Design a protein with these regions (language model features):
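Short S/T/G/P-rich N-terminal loop/turn motif that feeds into the first structured element of a domain
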Residues: 1-68, 78-98
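Helix-adjacent hinge/juxtasegments
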Residues: 74-76
Length: 98
C-alpha cells in the first residue's frame, strides 16, 4: 500500500526552504526513497505550507525518516519555521488521475 507523509509548517523564509530541499535532494541522489514530493501553500494563510511526500510503502517512509539526511532536513525545517511542525502519516487508500 502506498504511503504519504505531510509536513505542515509556517515560514516567511520559503526561499531558504527551497534551497534546503535542493540540498537534501543532492545529498540523497542515487539512494533517495521517496518517489514524489509536492509543496503547496495555503491561499488563506500565505505563510502556511504543506510538503507532501509519497512513498511506495509505509516501511519505505519509515526507512526514509530514519536516514541521517532526512533528520538533518527536519532539523533545518524546524529552524526556519515560525511554528512547530505538524507531521501526518497517511495510508493511500485510493488514487485517481482525473
Amino acid at each position: 500500500m502506498k504511503f504519504a507523509q505531510i509536513i505542515e509548517f509556517t515560514t516567511q523564509r520559503i526561499d531558504e526552504f527551497n534551497a534546503g530541499l535542493d540540498e537534501w535532494m543532492a545529498r540523497s541522489e542515487g539512494h533517495r526513497i521517496p518517489h514524489r514530493a509536492v509543496l503547496r501553500r495555503d491561499r488563506d494563510a500565505q505563510d502556511r505550507y504543506l510538503l507532501m511526500v509519497e512513498f511506495a510503502s509505509h516501511e519505505q517512509g519509515m526507512e526514509n525518516s530514519g536516514r541521517p539526511e532526512t533528520g538533518q532536513f527536519a532539523a533545518f525545517l524546524a529552524g526556519i519555521s515560525d511554528s512547530s511542525l505538524t507531521f501526518r502519516n497517511l495510508d493511500v487508500l485510493r488514487e485517481e488521475d482525473l
